[in-house]
């Protein structure tokens, strides 16, 4: 249990979820510190900014349960020196999901789950609710904020290894169920069953995308509201206008017109995310004008269609690494930059996912003006595989394999929007390219 009289020690503090949680607890007045690998990660910047101490893994960091509450990252096993020290000393730990569940039970809680769109929707909902009431949040891009006496707690609920089954929220948004994590889930049915279990643990209402048949198949004893573009949806986005500055639309709530909303975001998926946010806020009786203002002032989530301009070249950084996400990002890029050449630099993420979706990746990348593919990003749990980036390139006419040593090839693309997409360390490719501009 969390205790302000003890140090909260994070084993693996630089993981995106762990970093978010550390920031949230620090904001709430807890004594937070932790350890991780020495290799630089972007999540350590906000931790260091607020003075959270980050050490290298060392068994001497582990004291006792009288002095510390140990929060262990999901990726760390008995071969980690601090996990081993806990076992040797009889020191108990709690998991990241179990710690988040403690916070879930303190507030009106809204979890955001789904294969795609979790981070964007969590960021947007936290921003909108934060305009009207104290709101704490945990976002999967390494951001977390704790506010004393929060009315709302908004958090990203990750389905990997069924971690989100530790949570029992008041509300839950489910954006979609699109098979992923083939290294853990056996098949689509196994994957869908995890979401059914998560739905079973939601207390007040479930908000689901109306076009997703698997979401429609979920059985619940609580209200299940749909959102989308169809007349049959409980919350329907209508009269949609798309421009190069964003999108605007009206929302009908059970047939009642809630008025006009505007977002400086792009693509159908952004309108769907906004409609889900409106649905939750409306259900919690948040004033419509406050929702409108929150949507209008939202500037986007980290690594979700993040833009930079370099003369006639626009650079977009996006986390997309699944075919559905890639299609959405490409659609958004075409909306924002209809007159530019569309160039994609794609980093395949894990060998198992690349093998599973090889044909989808090839089909998507054949439809852009120019595709570059970096070497496959291997995860800690899957160091190698029987597929390479070259296997994709040979099926995508005009595409090339790109690495840091030939990143200058990208400068040949004039009057272009260059989209760097991937969930691994693709920012290093973007950084190297930008130094050439």
Curated annotation (Swiss-Prot):
GO terms for cellular component: cytoplasm. It comes from the Bacteria. ATP binds at residues 114-120. It catalyses: UDP-N-acetyl-alpha-D-muramate + L-alanine + ATP = UDP-N-acetyl-alpha-D-muramoyl-L-alanine + ADP + phosphate + H(+). Its EC number is 6.3.2.8. InterPro entries: Mur-like_cat_sf (IPR036565), Mur_ligase_C (IPR004101), Mur_ligase_C_dom_sf (IPR036615), Mur_ligase_cen (IPR013221), Mur_ligase_N (IPR000713), MurCDEF_pg_biosynth (IPR050061), UDP-N-AcMur_Ala_ligase_MurC (IPR005758). Keywords: ATP-binding, Cell cycle, Cell division, Cell shape, Cell wall biogenesis/degradation, Cytoplasm, Ligase, Nucleotide-binding, Peptidoglycan synthesis. Belongs to the MurCDEF family. Cell wall formation. This is UDP-N-acetylmuramate--L-alanine ligase. The gene is murC.
């Amino acid at each position: 249990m969390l205790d302000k009289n003890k140090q909260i020690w994070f084993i693996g503090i630089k993981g995106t979820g762990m970093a978010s949680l550390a920031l949230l607890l620090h904001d709430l007045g807890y004594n937070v510190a932790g350890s991780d690998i020495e290799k630089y990660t972007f999540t350590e910047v906000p931790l260091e900014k607020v003075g959270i101490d980050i050490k290298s893994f060392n068994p001497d960091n582990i004291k006792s349960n009288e002095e510390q509450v140990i929060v262990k990252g999901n990726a760390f096993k008995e071969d980690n020196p601090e996990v081993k020290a806990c076992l040797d000393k009889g020191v108990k730990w709690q998991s990241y999901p179990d710690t988040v569940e403690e916070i879930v039970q303190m507030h009106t809680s809204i979890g955001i789950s789904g294969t795609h769109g979790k981070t964007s929707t969590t960021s947007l909902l936290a921003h909108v609710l934060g305009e009207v009431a104290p709101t704490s949040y945990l976002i999967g891009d390494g951001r977390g904020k704790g506010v004393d006496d929060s009315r709302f707690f908004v958090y990203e609920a990750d389905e990997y290894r069924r971690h989100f089954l530790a949570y029992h929220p008041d509300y839950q948004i489910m954006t979609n169920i699109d098979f992923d994590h083939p290294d853990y889930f056996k098949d689509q049915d196994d994957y869908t069953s995890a979401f059914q279990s998560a739905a079973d643990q939601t207390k007040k209402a479930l908000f689901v995308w109306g076009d997703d048949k698997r979401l429609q198949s979920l059985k619940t004893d609580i209200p299940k509201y749909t959102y989308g573009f169809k007349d049959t949806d409980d919350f329907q986005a209508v009269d949609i206008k798309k421009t190069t500055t964003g999108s605007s639309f009206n929302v009908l709530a059970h047939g009642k017109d809630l008025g006009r909303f505007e977002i400086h975001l792009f693509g159908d998926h952004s309108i769907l995310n906004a409609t889900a946010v409106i649905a939750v806020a409306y259900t919690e009786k948040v004033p419509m004008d406050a929702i409108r203002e929150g949507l209008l002032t939202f500037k986007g989530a980290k690594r979700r269609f993040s833009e930079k301009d370099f003369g006639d070249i626009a650079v977009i950084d996006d986390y997309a690494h699944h075919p559905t996400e890639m299609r959405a990002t490409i659609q958004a890029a075409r909306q924002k930059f209809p007159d530019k050449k569309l160039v994609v630099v794609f980093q395949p993420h894990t060998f198992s996912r690349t093998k599973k979706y090889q044909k989808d990746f090839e089909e998507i990348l054949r439809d852009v003006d120019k595709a570059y593919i970096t070497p496959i990003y291997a995860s800690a749990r899957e160091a190698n595989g029987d597929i390479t980036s070259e296997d994709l390139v040979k099926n995508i006419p005009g595409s090339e394999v790109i690495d840091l040593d030939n990143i200058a090839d990208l400068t040949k693309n004039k009057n272009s929007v260059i989209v760097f997409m991937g969930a691994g360390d693709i920012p290093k490719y973007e950084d190297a390219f930008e130094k050439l501009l």
